[in-house]
């Protein structure tokens, strides 16, 4: 769909194994390469975070000769990549100081969490500072705004244009999409899930009002550590102070076990999505905020459909 009239194409490189980034980046031959973090996705094939780093940085072999690399400088793995093809990497992060031996070129301070209304932060750049109004909830979206700022500057946008662009961002279905229906707020974040994004979404829910209900399903492709990684999410639920957890799936039982450590959190576990949804529909009421999140194969958009059906 890219035509001569288009000036810029932004492409997400979705990978789950070694060699896939080589194939995709060879097609794209990017002028700018961005890696936002080295999380815990696709461990089944990639083994460790070092494996994930290796697979994602295959991109560097296919950059244009004068290409630019932009990395999250607060990530312990990415911060080791200080130079690519003889050119310094552009680093971004939260706070001017770094826990690693790098200089952040673009960074955020004065971060304010306004719940579902989004985030605010002061973003500092070599071209000047600006106040960013980020209309999507979650502290992780401050990092996304920083990455966008870095790309915008490389493309020659002004600080004002970048600030306007951040303020006008809109969500899409399955990606922290807020739905207001039947007096409830549904946070539709069910396109996919991994341990890092799951914790970020739970944090978003924890900063909302009303009864806070997490509806979670299994996370896939996590390899030998899958049970422990699911238990860690259950611990995050318990620590978050949310009011209720509904979960379904084979591994989601680990969420339930750990979440019960907080007696203030009502825990409901069912083996199947259908059974869980039936119980959930009988439980929710006006004023509730409901987060829905799971890996794609769990088909949790059907849960969102059930919640929002008139």
Where are the regions a protein language model picked out?
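Switch II (G3) loop of P-loop NTPases
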Residues: 7-18, 186-192
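Short SAM/SAH-binding signature in class I
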Residues: 8, 32, 147, 285-294
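Acidic, Mg2+-coordinating active-site environments of NTP-dependent enzymes
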Residues: 34-186, 210, 235-244, 252-266
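Active-site beta-alpha connecting loops in nucleotide-dependent enzymes
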Residues: 172, 190, 194-263, 269
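ATP-dependent carboxylate/acyl-activation modules
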Residues: 173-175, 297-303
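Short acidic-hydrophobic, aromatic-tinged amphipathic segments that line or gate anion-handling sites
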Residues: 267-276
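Short amphipathic alpha-helix with an adjacent loop that forms part of the alpha/beta core around
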Residues: 277-283
């Amino acid at each position: 769909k890219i035509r001569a009239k288009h000036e810029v194409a932004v492409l997400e490189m979705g990978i789950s194994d070694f060699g896939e980034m080589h194939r995709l980046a060879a097609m794209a031959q990017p002028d700018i390469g961005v890696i936002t973090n080295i999380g815990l996705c696709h461990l089944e094939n990639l083994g460790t975070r070092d494996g994930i780093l290796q697979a994602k940085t295959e991109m560097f072999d296919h950059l244009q000769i004068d290409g630019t690399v932009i990395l999250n400088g607060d990530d312990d793995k990415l911060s080791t990549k200080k130079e690519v093809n003889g050119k310094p990497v552009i680093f971004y992060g939260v706070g001017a100081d770094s826990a690693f031996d790098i200089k952040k070129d673009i960074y955020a301070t004065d971060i304010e969490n306004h719940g579902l209304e989004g985030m605010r932060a002061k973003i500092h750049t070599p071209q000047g500072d600006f106040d960013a109004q980020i209309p999507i909830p979650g502290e992780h979206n401050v990092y996304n705004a920083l990455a966008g700022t870095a790309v915008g500057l490389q493309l020659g946008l002004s600080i004002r244009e970048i600030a306007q662009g951040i303020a006008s961002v809109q969500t899409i279905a399955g990606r922290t999409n807020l739905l207001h229906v039947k007096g409830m707020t549904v946070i539709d974040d069910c396109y996919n899930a991994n341990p890092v994004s799951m914790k970020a979404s739970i944090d978003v829910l924890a900063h909302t009002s009303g009864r806070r209900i997490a509806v979670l399903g299994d996370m896939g492709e996590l390899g030998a550590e899958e049970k422990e990684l699911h238990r860690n999410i259950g611990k995050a639920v318990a620590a978050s102070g949310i009011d209720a957890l509904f979960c379904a799936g084979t591994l989601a039982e680990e969420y339930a076990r750990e979440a019960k450590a907080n007696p203030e959190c009502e825990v409901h576990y069912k083996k199947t999505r259908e059974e869980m949804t039936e119980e959930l529909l009988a439980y929710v009421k006006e004023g509730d905020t409901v987060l829905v999140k799971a890996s794609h194969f769990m088909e949790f958009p059907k849960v969102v459909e059930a919640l929002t059906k008139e």
